[in-house]
């Protein structure tokens, strides 16, 4: 499968509808389509038995940066199922250009792809880490070195975590979240670095800090979170179809 269309393109909904219909016709069963961050949020919400009344959010770190939200026990999708594009929140008005058309998107600074690019700018890291492989293997090499005490690798990852924490704090402020889970392949090896940064930033700047804390947790299965959420979607479609739009078949 090809990546999802760039945020903001008008053909996104039509592309997903065609994908659902085509797959359903080909395999002969109903088909659900959901983005990875939203699916991960739903899976984390169900597996953690979060109270329905709690405003729950999930940050999904991979080659992009996404978010998912569960309010009142239901996944929040927005007007066109495009809610949660955290990666395209600008943190620098004159920053790096993004394919979405904006400047300074957090995805250009905090995604696993951005972290690998930053690591490759350090000759000492290129000399001792396998950074010429695939994006995922190169990122894992940086993350592993960071948690094992490499100061340069740690600095690169910590800077990415700082960028992500600023965007995630803005998200928590905007939605008055009570719990936030970090998940996705990007936190599988070095989640503690991201969690420490986010907890510190929330404790200093979250608007709700005098009323309630924002609990930050790490996913128990960050690499599989989206797949687990997809399974939850299937279960939810059978027991609460009103919360699962876009079923083809």
Task: Set out the residue ranges of the language-model regions.
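ATP-binding/phosphotransfer module of carbohydrate and carboxylate kinases, centering on a glycine-rich
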Residues: 21, 25-29, 47-51, 102, ...
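Phosphate-binding/catalytic loop of phosphoryl-transfer enzymes
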Residues: 1-117, 229, 235-249
